[in-house]
Design a protein with these regions (language model features):
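ATP-dependent adenylation/nucleotidyltransferase module used to activate substrates
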Residues: 1-157, 168, 176-178
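AMP-forming adenylation/ATP pyrophosphatase catalytic core
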Residues: 126-133, 138-367
Length: 367
């Protein structure tokens, strides 16, 4: 037996196939599924399906029983509400666009998995994420998955080296098509054909506006009609409340300017939304703040090598772009990145993730 592994299970194909692979490799597997919320307001349960729904929890438990290993349902509702949902609300109400998956991975899926693993005597933790772990100069790094289309390192950049030391990514060297084929070979035809959800797990139909209205007590007082302005401050028209817009948005603006208009800036304090052209969304630099106590991205960090180019991703679906220069955060202050070519849609609240030689060397939250 190679060791005891606590596997985070969602009931979906990725974690289920991860269990199959770990068992075949000789690990003792223990399944764990999170109960993160249960009210209609916090509402993936309202649609009855999804990674956190009652159905998915029961499916994970059923799959574990079929494969012959124990399964635990762990109540993380309070932690999830405090760390993930409240941050999601606060960021949107501040005029920023958050990425809750980043916080969930570091604080819930790893922070709590490690705690539960210790309680159950597990040596390792594992998930069905598409990522790998590599060693360089005595340090462990996240590395891009073999399936570049599914690579999830963008969402995992906050993981610390200590967390990586105990982590196994069974799917890191596989493509999604290979994972589906493994599921079919083990008799999970329905799971192999099941469509993947791209929604935020606690927001029904990705309608974050309805979610905010239901979860912010003074929503109607804080979210009111305001001014659309151009980059020079000229008033162009009236918007329906700043939280209804995100950087780069073009559709649903409710205003005709004779040319395509995009949201380029949101100011929650003044309730103003700036509109501009597509070119106004191009930037050659950005500022970011660190969001981890790990040693990465400090000026004395030995992980950053000067003889290898660095690239950055500012969105999950975007390509990593070359970084020509950078100023790293000191004493938890902000840092700056400068790009060779203009980058489209730099969005406050989203993550920027830094790579060298396919390894994640750090990241931050765009400001």
């Amino acid at each position: 037996m190679k060791g005891k592994v606590l596997l985070g299970m969602s009931g979906g194909i990725d974690s289920t196939v991860s269990a199959m692979l770990l068992l075949e490799q000789g690990y003792e597997v223990v399944g764990c599924t999170f109960r993160t919320f249960d009210s209609i307001k916090e509402s993936c349960l309202a649609r009855e399906k999804g990674c956190c729904s009652v159905e998915s929890i029961m499916e994970a438990k059923h799959n574990a029983e079929q494969m012959g290993f124990e399964h635990h349902i762990v109540d993380f509702r309070e932690t999830f509400r405090r760390c993930v949902i409240q941050n999601f609300i606060d960021e949107y109400m501040a005029g920023r666009t958050p990425n809750p998956c980043v916080l969930c991975n570091s604080h819930i899926k790893w922070g709590e998995l490690v705690r539960v693993a210790d309680e159950l005597g597990c040596d390792y933790i594992a998930t069905g994420h598409y990522a790998r772990i590599r060693e360089r100069d005595g340090h462990l790094y996240l590395a891009a998955a073999a399936d570049t289309r599914k690579d999830q390192t963008y969402f995992l950049w906050m993981l610390t080296e200590d967390q990586l030391r105990r982590t196994i990514f069974p799917l890191g060297d596989l493509t999604k098509d290979q994972v589906r084929e493994i599921a079919r070979q083990h008799g999970y035809e329905t799971l192999a054909e099941k469509k993947e959800s791209q929604e935020i797990c606690f927001v029904t139909d990705n309608d974050y506006r309805t979610f905010l209205r239901a979860n912010v007590p003074d929503y109607d007082e804080r979210v009111r009609a305001g001014e659309y302005v151009d980059k020079d401050g000229k008033v162009l028209g009236t918007h329906q409340g700043y939280v209804n817009y995100t950087i780069g948005q073009r559709k649903g603006l409710g205003i005709a300017l004779g040319a395509p208009a995009y949201v380029t800036h949101i100011d929650a304090a003044t309730n103003r939304v700036t509109l501009g052209t597509n070119d106004d969304l191009l930037a050659t630099e950005l500022r970011f703040r660190p969001m981890t106590n790990d040693t990465r991205l400090t000026t004395n960090d030995q992980r950053l090598t000067t003889n290898s180019p660095m690239t950055a991703k500012v969105r999950y679906r975007s390509q990593a772009v070359p970084v020509t220069n950078y100023q790293l955060p000191i004493n938890n202050q902000t840092g700056s990145l400068f790009f060779r070519e203009p980058v489209w849609g730099v969005t406050p609240g989203q993550s920027v993730v830094l790579y060298q030689d396919g390894l994640v060397v750090g990241g931050g939250i765009i400001i």
